[in-house]
């Protein structure tokens, strides 16, 4: 019942459709048994009688109160209408190959106890409030609903919880507001586009026999759909359209949506020189690294300009064959493009500035977990982009796997329902319906700023790749597909029937397209010279990082520290936390004592002062997993928040920090994408514990480590991985440094394990300084846990106001007499502090040993270590000491590199845990025994 009172009017005044139907059904129930309804409802019926149509609908044949003989018919009509809305998609014409049984009794009238004659007596508006004006009665309204809900477009939005959205969606469908009739000019243009799409595929099929191209045929309408989407969003003066897709149909999208010249694509098939393949101005600008990638993984940018004031860049993201993983990266692109980071405070987001389109596969959409991870980002504060357009390029098969083996749902799109995303299924053979679906989607996003999904249902004309014979595993299906006309042929026949074009004109389009493609091919084929490949990175990458100034004057540090502690007078943080943070006011007294947390926030404050925006995200990153950070303060009385880094006076760029969802894969992808697009921004992703970084392994393997070598895609992403063996077990000990080192080559990233607050400060500032430079690269830092509050890690003021990041550090109390040193211990991270602690606590003669901490594991500090080793003339041995197992940690990476630089005759050996399948002990006492053994053995002098 409505809570709104209309007294003295009847309480159901204004009800219509399903709501009025529910009241009528209740009244029918009341007539049969008054006690079957609740007391309040019974009182309403006793006072007001049955619902009257005249107050709820404006219809000439609805002037009387519903008689008892019509109540059952009205209830049936309303239930039937709702059933059509909910289930019409099950009998819709959305399958090009597998035709739906339109004679199904699913929507038969007798199932709802209503006849055609009775329906004629039911007012139109009772059934369909937004029906077109030409409908005369309930029967026509029902037939109208059947038509709009069971045609080549089918709709699912009953799972959308917001009533305003649901009503808007229903109105769009039932009024057919989205379904504008295309003028003949646009119909001809659509046929021309389909001719280009099909002609391109056929030409490659005939010319490059058996070569992989992952044809779009069967889903040809995807290209005109993208055309329509770009045209629609450009009406909002959108700056960027970001597209993510896999390899199916990618070459066609590159050629037609991105404008990559045909001859450039042909040259990739021929592996010909590319001097003829420079793209036209503003079209199809593609990028490759020095090792490159296959042609159907490459991305491109295209600039579209109607006039000087309206310019849009369309980007297709580079993508490996790991299906769906590009989705969060594209979302990161879009968010970065939408935000203004040029002034202090939080970034200012304008969702009209960028639009993301994600093209999925029907097997991968329900099959890959990164899909739902990405969908979950869609309405989160730190990640939303104002709605993305999802298109499932649904060819009803995954390689050789059929639907019943690839998903447990009715539709490939069903996972989207859990996120309340409206779904339109559309038959890929109906070109005009496909274009209309795009208009529907763009209008929804414009109004509600949420995701929309189009399930584009077609088929795959050939095998998974063109060297594959699909009839081996799907003989019946491919017997049907071979007889099935192409999308272009179907649409050409339609336009001939509508007398928009003649058969001769349609044929001429086809012939002209072939001749043009042949002309472009001959331009490439005429050059027979052999192409030379350069597989080495450019010199500026080989040469390493430039020297940059990272020290900051004491006066600036003190001023920034004061501003960070200058909270609004009315703001009341947690009292215990307030005391802890206020202690920082004295951090620069005397020689100074700056701990890790203060060094971090001062690094960011100084980076903002320099005009570099900062974005940090991760699980619990606002506070910090180990409660050391507190970038977001909470008022203990009002729960309002205060972000000190957004209020410092001298900041010249924005700062953002977000607690991420419990997701690694999509979040790393998002931050990588954000960073790639926003090259001027220091973007950091932090793992809750370093152990969980392998939840994003694909992102590191395919993008972060190799993106530049494959695609020329620069990134300065910073990854913070809490790492260290402290008895917390195999899930809370290791950031898997060995995995990052195993992929370390060609200066593709920096891997560091810092042991002082100043080192952390300098390496963050160095990273910010190299952004937008050719030498930029990702930075992987193994960050501390227990050391966060260890005073040994704190640094004096001079360490921040002087110097720079050092790739190696030496134990300050050792090595003063080089002639006495017999053993040098090389180590990294927390264990170095434990070794130092052991030395300090044991009053012995330690002149025979020296400890060198390797702070930068990659690039390997060859020169620094080699030059230092030369200074110990009586050196007898070098030990690499680590707390990780021998097959993990840095040993495997470091051993051959250290051996290359050892003084002649000096042996290298290992001290640490033995080979293990699990990274750490699960029993605290066992951990302590191992840790003690490693430290003791390292610092025990041999006889």
Curated annotation (Swiss-Prot):
GO MF, one annotated term: thiamine pyrophosphate binding
Family annotation (InterPro entries): 2oxoglutarate_DH_E1, 2oxoglutarate_DH_E1_bac, DH_E1, KGD_C_sf, ODO-1/KGD_C, THDP-binding, Transketolase-like_Pyr-bd
Cofactor names: thiamine diphosphate
SMART domains in alphabetical order: Transket_pyr (SM00861)
Coiled-coil region: none
Alphabetical UniProt keywords: Glycolysis, Oxidoreductase, Thiamine pyrophosphate
E.C. numbers: 1.2.4.2
Enzyme class: oxidoreductase
One annotated Gene Ontology cellular component of this protein: cytosol
Reactions this protein catalyses: N(6)-[(R)-lipoyl]-L-lysyl-[protein] + 2-oxoglutarate + H(+) = N(6)-[(R)-S(8)-succinyldihydrolipoyl]-L-lysyl-[protein] + CO2
A biological-process GO annotation: glycolytic process
Described function: E1 component of the 2-oxoglutarate dehydrogenase (OGDH) complex which catalyzes the decarboxylation of 2-oxoglutarate, the first step in the conversion of 2-oxoglutarate to succinyl-CoA and CO(2).
Protein family per UniProt: Belongs to the alpha-ketoglutarate dehydrogenase family.
Assembly and interaction partners: Homodimer. Part of the 2-oxoglutarate dehydrogenase (OGDH) complex composed of E1 (2-oxoglutarate dehydrogenase), E2 (dihydrolipoamide succinyltransferase) and E3 (dihydrolipoamide dehydrogenase); the complex contains multiple copies of the three enzymatic components (E1, E2 and E3).
Protein name as catalogued: 2-oxoglutarate dehydrogenase E1 component
């Amino acid at each position: 019942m409505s809570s709104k009172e209309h007294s003295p009017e009847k309480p159901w005044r204004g009800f219509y459709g399903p709501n009025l139907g529910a009241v009528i059904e209740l009244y029918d129930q009341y007539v049969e048994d008054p006690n079957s309804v609740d007391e309040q409802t019974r009182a309403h019926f006793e006072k007001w009688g049955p619902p009257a149509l005249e107050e709820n609908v404006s219809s000439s044949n609805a002037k009387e109160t519903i008689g008892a003989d019509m109540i059952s018919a009205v209830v049936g009509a309303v239930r039937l209408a709702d059933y059509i809305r909910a289930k019409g998609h099950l009998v819709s014409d959305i399958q090009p190959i597998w035709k739906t049984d339109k004679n199904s009794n699913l929507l038969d009238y007798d199932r709802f106890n209503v006849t055609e004659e009775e329906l004629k007596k039911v007012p139109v508006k009772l059934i369909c409030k937004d029906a077109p004006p030409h409908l005369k009665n309930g029967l026509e309204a029902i037939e109208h609903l059947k038509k709009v809900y069971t045609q080549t477009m089918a709709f699912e939005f009953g799972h959308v919880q917001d009533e305003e959205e649901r009503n808007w969606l229903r109105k769009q469908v039932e009024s057919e507001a989205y379904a504008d009739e295309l003028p003949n000019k646009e119909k001809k243009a659509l046929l021309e586009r389909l001719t280009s799409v099909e002609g391109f595929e056929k030409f490659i099929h005939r010319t490059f026999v058996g070569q992989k191209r992952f044809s779009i045929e069967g889903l040809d309408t995807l290209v005109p759909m993208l055309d329509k989407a770009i045209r629609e969003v450009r009406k909002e003066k959108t700056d960027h359209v970001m597209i993510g897709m896999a390899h199916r149909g990618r070459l066609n999208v590159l050629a037609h949506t991105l404008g990559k010249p045909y001859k450039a694509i042909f040259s990739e098939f021929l592996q010909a020189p590319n001097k003829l393949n420079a793209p036209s101005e503003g079209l199809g600008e593609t990028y490759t690294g020095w090792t490159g990638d296959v042609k159907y993984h490459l991305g491109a940018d295209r600039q579209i300009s109607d006039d000087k004031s309206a310019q849009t860049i369309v980007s297709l993201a580079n993508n490996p064959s790991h299906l769906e993983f590009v989705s969060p990266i594209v979302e990161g692109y879009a968010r970065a493009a939408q935000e203004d980071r040029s002034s202090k405070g939080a970034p200012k987001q304008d969702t009209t500035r960028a639009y993301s389109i994600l093209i999925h596969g029907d097997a991968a959409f329900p099959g890959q977990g990164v899909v739902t991870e990405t969908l979950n980002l869609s309405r989160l504060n730190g990640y939303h982009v104002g709605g993305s357009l999802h298109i499932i390029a649904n060819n009803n098969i995954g390689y050789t796997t059929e639907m019943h083996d690839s998903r447990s749902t009715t539709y490939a799109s069903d996972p989207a329902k859990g996120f309340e995303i409206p779904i339109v299924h559309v038959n890929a053979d109906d070109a005009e319906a496909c274009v209309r679906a795009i208009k529907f989607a763009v209008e929804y996003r414009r109004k509600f700023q949420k995701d929309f999904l189009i399930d584009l249902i077609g088929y795959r004309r050939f095998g998974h790749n063109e060297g594959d014979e699909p009839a081996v595993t799907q003989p019946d299906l491919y017997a049907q597909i071979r007889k099935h006309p192409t999308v272009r042929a179907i649409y050409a026949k339609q336009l001939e029937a509508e007398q928009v074009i003649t058969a001769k004109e349609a044929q001429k389009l086809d012939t002209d397209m072939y001749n043009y493609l042949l002309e472009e091919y001959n331009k490439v084929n005429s050059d027979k010279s052999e192409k030379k490949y350069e597989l080495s990175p450019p010199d500026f990458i080989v040469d390493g990082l430039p020297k940059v100034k990272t020290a900051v004057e004491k006066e600036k540090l003190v001023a920034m520290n004061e501003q960070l502690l200058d909270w609004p007078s009315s703001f009341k943080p947690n009292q215990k936390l307030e005391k802890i943070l206020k202690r920082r006011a004295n951090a620069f007294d005397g020689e100074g004592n700056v701990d890790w947390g203060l060094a971090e926030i001062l690094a960011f404050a100084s980076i903002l002062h320099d005009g570099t925006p900062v974005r940090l995200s991760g699980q619990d990153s606002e506070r910090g997993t180990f409660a050391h950070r507190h970038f977001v303060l909470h008022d203990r009385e009002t729960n309002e928040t205060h972000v000190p880094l957004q209020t410092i006076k001298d900041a010249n760029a924005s700062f953002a920090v977000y607690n991420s969802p419990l997701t690694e894969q999509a979040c790393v992808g998002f931050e990588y994408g954000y960073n790639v697009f926003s090259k001027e921004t220091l973007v950091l992703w932090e793992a809750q514990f370093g152990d969980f970084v392998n939840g994003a392994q694909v992102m590191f393997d395919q993008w972060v480590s190799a993106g530049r070598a494959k695609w020329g895609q620069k990134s300065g992403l910073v990854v913070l991985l809490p790492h260290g063996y402290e008895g917390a077990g195999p899930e809370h000990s290791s950031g898997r440094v060995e995995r990052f080192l195993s992929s370390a080559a060609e200066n593709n990233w920096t891997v560091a394990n810092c042991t002082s607050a100043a080192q952390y400060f300098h390496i963050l500032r160095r990273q910010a300084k190299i952004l937008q430079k050719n030498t930029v690269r990702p930075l992987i830092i193994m960050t501390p846990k227990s050391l966060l509050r260890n005073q040994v890690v704190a640094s004096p003021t001079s360490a921040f106001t002087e110097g720079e990041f050092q790739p190696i550090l030496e134990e300050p109390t050792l090595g003063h007499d080089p002639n006495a040193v017999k053993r040098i211990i090389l180590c990294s991270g927390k264990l170095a502090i434990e070794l130092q602690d052991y030395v300090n606590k044991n009053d012995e003669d330690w002149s025979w040993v020296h400890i060198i901490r390797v702070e930068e594991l990659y690039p390997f500090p060859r020169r620094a270590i080699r030059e230092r080793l030369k200074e110990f003339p009586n050196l007898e041995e070098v030990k690499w000491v680590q707390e990780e197992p021998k097959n993990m940690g840095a040993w495997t990476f470091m051993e051959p590199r250290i051996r290359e630089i050892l003084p002649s005759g000096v042996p290298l050996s290992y001290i640490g845990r033995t080979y293990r399948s699990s990274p750490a002990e699960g029993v605290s006492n066992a951990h302590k025994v191992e840790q003690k053994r490693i430290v003791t053995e390292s610092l025990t002098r041999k006889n």
